[in-house]
Amino acid sequence: MTMSARVRKMALPSNCDLSDVEMICDNVLGCLEDLDSSRVVSRVTSREDVDESTIGDLISLDCVSLETPLFSFLFLGVTLFLFLSLLQQSLVFLLGVFLRLVQLVGHFLLLLMGEQIGVIDKAMSHIPLPEVGQHSQQVQIQHLVERRFGLDVVTAIVVIGDNELFQVVGHQFRVGIMSDGQRSQQSQNSGMNVASSSRGRHQLVPDRPGSQLSSQKLSSLVPLARIAAAEIPCAVQQSLSRLFARSVQNRQVQRPHLDPQRQRNIVGVFGVQHGRAVLLCALGGDLIEKRPNQLVRVVKVLVDKFPRRLPKRLVHLVHLGRGSLVHCRCDRVCQQRGCCHLWHCGGHFFVGLVSWIVDETAACVVFCLFKVVSETQRISSLPRYMHRELNTAGVVWGCGGKHM
């Protein structure tokens, strides 16, 4: 339908004719044609102060202005996300590098500490040891230690495994094999204990660089203070067995095997008080060899049972091979329950737990072996809790009264 037809249908005033309506329609059509974009641009470009580039810029800017907020927010969000991800990865990498450096520094310090201990041991190994074959020499050594430390304990014995007795006398390391129920005989010439076998022979192995001990024997070493005879009286064994059984039963810990009639299963700690030998404590050798962790718990049970009756003075002095004198002075200076001590013998390190135990008759010091570490492995191979205990323990290295 044409425009004129549409106009004819419209209600028109009575004084209007058809020619007037056609003229109005022509004017309207002309105005519509003027609205064409090309004609608008041509008319605008006819002005002197406006060109086509200006109009293009205006049109493009107008289009961009309609899309700028959404595009900007999207671009900024993606950029911020990528930046934070990269920053996080960088921080994690730097933290890992820092922790690795700290670990390397700590490992180096531990190695340095092991080197220092090795140097001390090497220097002490060249110290000339006195001859122990003469009784006068042993008396002189004992008097020397008494004057410098105020002690009357200079030797130690060690019970290993089933029937082997390791004995430290003066400054010499002795190895003897004992049969069941057979006591060690005391030498009248030298004044020292010598372990004899059932076949009537003595096996003496002095401490020298060439003498080596098996790792199985070393793993069960327990240093003890000196006693007059190696055999433990059965009455004392039974008393300690009952005391130990009561303590274990109270805490529901498995009781170790303590046979009063057989010495080979007894590992005891002995001390010297007022010039006489006193049995301090006895434990099962099988328990130390097979279940050391359980023994540590048992020791803690006994310590907790008698926490207050600590002696005013009790000293445990042991000399274990190659001039390495380990001196632990247990008086007011060292009354920490469960402190860890480092022992050394023949190129091996012994880390043990020293605890206080008190019964009705005597004060008890228990040394429990944790681990044997060869000199090549250094201290760094020990578990972390041992490092922590060693740092807080009263470990004194010395030789001839000179502490290191």
Swiss-Prot record:
The keyword Transmembrane helix applies. It comes from the Eukaryota. This is Peroxisomal biogenesis factor 9. Essential for the import of peroxisomal matrix proteins. Residues 181-198 have a biased composition (Polar residues). Disulfide bonds: none annotated. The chain crosses the membrane at residues 73-93, 94-114, 149-169, 349-369. Induction: By growth on oleic acid. Keywords: Membrane, Peroxisome, Transmembrane, Transmembrane helix. It is a multi-pass membrane protein. Its main location: membrane. GO terms for cellular component: peroxisomal membrane. The keyword Transmembrane applies.
